[in-house]
């Protein structure tokens, strides 16, 4: 043994050839701080090892290295610029040491080789993988960019254009693609991988492969003419500006880094990479996006605990109510390996549900994500039925009939009589209280809400709603089932609107009040999209949700929270509803809609909306962008905080993920609680006070007032790794 540490070891495997194996005692290998320090010492040991002829990098896991340890990021980013720069110099000195070994080196890859793992293997002379290999640099998705030499080495290995595509998109390449662009030198069968790598390394040792020329290419400036350079980087900047936009600076910063470093040799180019990495790491966007990743891991951890605590797994499910929503739920369940009975009282609805599932599967088939055999198997695992026969075999029932409390209560009571005592029954509802529906059941402890978002196959969030009598066992089983479906389940307590709709309607309330006071709804949409970062402004979102749906939900919320959400007279939503302008569904709402060549609705502003709004809107008034943002966001933020204060949602992490996954809250802002920490709670309280005369929606919850007085934050030292 040449060197041994907790997460890696080095041994000589045959005359002069050493193997450095990453072998973390955990389930995956990560390039955490401890592993980096061990790698540094291992390379020192190799440098002083007599008779060294070549080095292989291997992993004892199904994945080579999944990346750096993201739990350590926020702690690192909290360092001063100088401290972070110094740490990056140390980290890069390790990979330089690997690259500068006086012998040929090869990385033997299988499974994921991502982020820091990819940057590590770029420092070796050769890379060989099997068909399971996936290699790439996802850092820009976290608001940063490669900082271990990825922006320097990758363009020199595969060319600037391919490198910029991978880095700016945060892309991972499959083995065949990586081979095609030169990121891998060979792809072989898994059984032959180790031996093939050994043979390749031996060929390099025997000078049959010019490994020194490869190394020189990586440590020299990029070979681009002035014209090539101008074309590559100008085009890349244009594409990135179009796709990433101004709220996500990491992709553009990566392009600038590669461009500026192109004319320098390795060490000078690494200095440039380090400078820009520090700038990104200190940004609010990086803090928010890394925080979201950690929050997502937190949600997944809760789901894993639920699955372990549940007395049984969901092996079969049933959906009551077909159509597009029921078909979407059935599709998602079957896709993830849980056969489902889809029951409805009308054959046309069953046909629509099966058509929806078939349409979604055909899309996957066209994208090459499944083959015909797999598609047929998934479709066959959805059983449409007009009867309850066979439903007794289901572990979980999802009721998804029309949003009517009497109809739902009847269906729930009926299905309970057809299933066993340990069958869990759930209701997919967005507005009807779970405690009310539970009254129709003999076993309310086996019942909870399971609120899917539309379209089911795209929206990651599922709200799991706990009623007063819902048992922990029921919650655990439903959370585990939602996770099995590939969703992100978040448990909330029952209240009008649950969590997501409850916090959405004060936002719509703020919008209605802006229109009442003379704001132009098209300007409000532009500000909330372009400046704040929502995927849709409030008027456009209302059109997509459906004005009729919003009108009904608004009435439910007004009844549930009359002080904050009760209305004084008619508003814009009422006016459109009364004019039968329901939004996209009937082609007219705030905007008018036509179908484009791709079959998608295209919105345009037409003046026929103005008379409809005339009696609920004041004469046109100009509002600056900050006022629009404040008047739109303060009501939502206050309601989110009240939900935490009242225990409707358990943690800031779950609230922020629900907002991003369920409403499209701008990811670069990290959710309401991350946003509050970024703005400063005391600053937010003062800002809200300036709008207090607008009504109760703008009155700050006591929790925020108390936290502001104590100088507290929601995340604080949380998610900060110990450095």
From Swiss-Prot:
Q: What residues does substrate bind to?
A: 296, 501, 661
Q: In which pathway does it act?
A: Lipid metabolism; fatty acid beta-oxidation
InterPro entries under this entry? Answer: 3-OHacyl-CoA_DH_CS, 3-OHacyl-CoA_DH_NAD-bd, 3HC_DH_C, 6-PGluconate_DH-like_C_sf, ClpP/crotonase-like_dom_sf, Enoyl-CoA_hydra/iso, FA_oxidation_alpha_subunit, FadB
Q: Where is this site: Important for catalytic activity?
A: 119, 139
Q: Name one GO cellular component term.
A: fatty acid beta-oxidation multienzyme complex
Q: Name one GO molecular function term.
A: 3-hydroxybutyryl-CoA epimerase activity
Which reactions are catalysed by this chain? a (3S)-3-hydroxyacyl-CoA + NAD(+) = a 3-oxoacyl-CoA + NADH + H(+); a (3S)-3-hydroxyacyl-CoA = a (2E)-enoyl-CoA + H2O; a 4-saturated-(3S)-3-hydroxyacyl-CoA = a (3E)-enoyl-CoA + H2O; (3S)-3-hydroxybutanoyl-CoA = (3R)-3-hydroxybutanoyl-CoA
- What PROSITE patterns would the database entry show? 3HCDH
- Any matching Pfam family: 3HCDH_N
- Where are the residues of the annotated region Enoyl-CoA hydratase/isomerase? 1-189
**Organism superkingdom:** Bacteria
Positions of the region 3-hydroxyacyl-CoA dehydrogenase?
311-723
| E.C. number(s) listed in UniProt | 4.2.1.17, 5.1.2.3, 5.3.3.8, 1.1.1.35
Query: What keywords were assigned to this record?
Result: Fatty acid metabolism, Isomerase, Lipid degradation, Lipid metabolism, Lyase, Multifunctional enzyme, NAD, Oxidoreductase
Catalytic residues as annotated in Swiss-Prot or TrEMBL? 451
In the record, biological process GO terms are: fatty acid beta-oxidation
- Summary of the function given for this chain in its UniProt record: Involved in the aerobic and anaerobic degradation of long-chain fatty acids via beta-oxidation cycle. Catalyzes the formation of 3-oxoacyl-CoA from enoyl-CoA via L-3-hydroxyacyl-CoA. It can also use D-3-hydroxyacyl-CoA and cis-3-enoyl-CoA as substrate.
User: Which HAMAP family does this chain map to?
Assistant: FadB
- What protein family does this chain belong to? In the N-terminal section; belongs to the enoyl-CoA hydratase/isomerase family.
Protein name from the UniProt record: Fatty acid oxidation complex subunit alpha
Source taxonomy: Bacteria, Pseudomonadati, Pseudomonadota, Gammaproteobacteria, Vibrionales
């Amino acid at each position: 043994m040449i060197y041994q540490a907790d997460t890696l070891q080095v041994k000589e495997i045959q005359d002069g050839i050493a193997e450095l194996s990453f072998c973390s005692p955990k389930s995956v290998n990560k390039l955490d701080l401890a592993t980096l320090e061990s790698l540094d010492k291992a390379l020192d040991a190799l440098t002083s090892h007599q008779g060294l002829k070549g080095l292989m990098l291997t992993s004892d896991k199904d994945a080579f290295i999944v990346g750096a340890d993201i739990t350590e990021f926020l702690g690192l980013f909290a360092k001063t610029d100088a401290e972070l720069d110094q740490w990056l110099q140390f980290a890069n000195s390790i990979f330089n040491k690997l690259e500068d070994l006086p012998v040929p080196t090869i990385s033997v890859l299988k499974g994921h080789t991502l982020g820091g793992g990819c940057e590590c293997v770029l420092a070796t002379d050769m890379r060989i993988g099997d068909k399971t290999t996936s290699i790439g640099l996802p850092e820009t998705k976290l608001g940063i960019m490669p900082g271990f030499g990825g922006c320097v080495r990758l363009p020199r290995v595969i060319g600037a254009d391919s490198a910029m595509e991978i880095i700016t998109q945060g892309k991972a390449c499959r083995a065949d693609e990586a081979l095609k662009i030169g990121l891998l030198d060979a792809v072989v069968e898994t059984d032959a991988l180790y031996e093939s790598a050994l043979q390749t390394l031996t060929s390099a040792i025997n000078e049959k492969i010019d490994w020194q020329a490869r190394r020189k290419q990586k440590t020299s400036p990029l070979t681009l003419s002035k014209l090539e350079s101008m074309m590559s980087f100008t085009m890349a900047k244009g594409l990135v500006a179009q796709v990433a936009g101004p709220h996500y600076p990491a992709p553009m910063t990566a392009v600038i880094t590669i461009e500026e470093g192109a004319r320098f040799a390795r060490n000078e180019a690494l200095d440039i990479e380090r400078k820009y990495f520090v700038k990104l790491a200190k940004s609010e966007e990086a803090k928010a996006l890394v925080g979201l990743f950690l929050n997502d891991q937190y949600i997944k951890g809760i789901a894993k605990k639920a699955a372990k605590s549940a007395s049984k797994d969901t092996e079969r499910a049933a959906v009551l109510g077909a159509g597009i929503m029921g078909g979407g739920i059935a599709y998602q369940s079957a896709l993830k390996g849980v056969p489902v009975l889809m029951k409805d009282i009308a054959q046309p609805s069953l046909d629509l549900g099966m058509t929806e599932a078939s349409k979604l599967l055909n899309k996957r088939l066209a994208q090459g994500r499944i083959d015909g055999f797999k598609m047929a198997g998934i479709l066959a695992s959805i059983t449409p039925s007009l009867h309850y026969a066979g439903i007794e075999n289901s572990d979980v029932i999802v009721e998804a009939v029309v949003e009517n409390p009497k109809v739902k209560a009847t269906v729930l009571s009926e299905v309970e009589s057809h299933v066993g005592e340990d069958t869990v029954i759930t209701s997919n509802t967005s507005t009807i209280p779970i405690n009310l529906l539970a009254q129709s059941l003999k076993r309310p402890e086996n019942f909870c809400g399971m609120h899917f978002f539309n379209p089911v196959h795209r929206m990651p969030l599922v709200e799991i709603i706990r009623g007063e009598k819902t048992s922990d066992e029921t919650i655990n089983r439903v959370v585990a089932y939602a996770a099995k479906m590939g969703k992100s389940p978040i448990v909330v307590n029952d209240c009008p609107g649950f969590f997501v709709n409850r916090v959405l309607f004060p936002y719509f309330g703020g919008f209605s009040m802006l229109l009442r006071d003379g704001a132009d709804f098209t300007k409000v949409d532009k500000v909330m999209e372009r400046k704040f970062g929502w995927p849709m402004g409030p008027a456009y979102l209302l059109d997509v949700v459906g004005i009729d749906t919003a009108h009904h939900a608004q009435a439910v919320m007004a009844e549930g929270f009359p002080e904050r959400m009760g209305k004084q007279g008619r508003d814009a939503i009422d006016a459109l509803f009364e004019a039968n302008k329901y939004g996209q569904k009937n082609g007219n709402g705030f905007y008018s809609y036509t179908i484009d060549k791709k079959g998608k609705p295209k919105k345009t502003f037409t003046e026929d909306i103005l008379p409809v709004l005339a009696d609920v809107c004041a004469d046109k008034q100009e509002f600056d962008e900050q006022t629009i943002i404040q008047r739109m966001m303060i009501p939502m933020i206050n309601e989110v905080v009240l939900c935490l204060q009242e225990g409707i949602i358990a943690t800031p992490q779950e609230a922020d993920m629900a907002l991003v996954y369920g409403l499209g809250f701008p990811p670069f802002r990290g959710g309401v609680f991350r946003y509050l920490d970024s703005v400063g709670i005391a600053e937010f309280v003062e800002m809200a006070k300036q709008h207090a005369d607008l009504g109760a929606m703008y009155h700050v919850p006591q929790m925020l007032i108390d936290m502001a007085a104590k100088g507290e934050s929601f995340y604080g030292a949380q998610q900060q790794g110990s450095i």
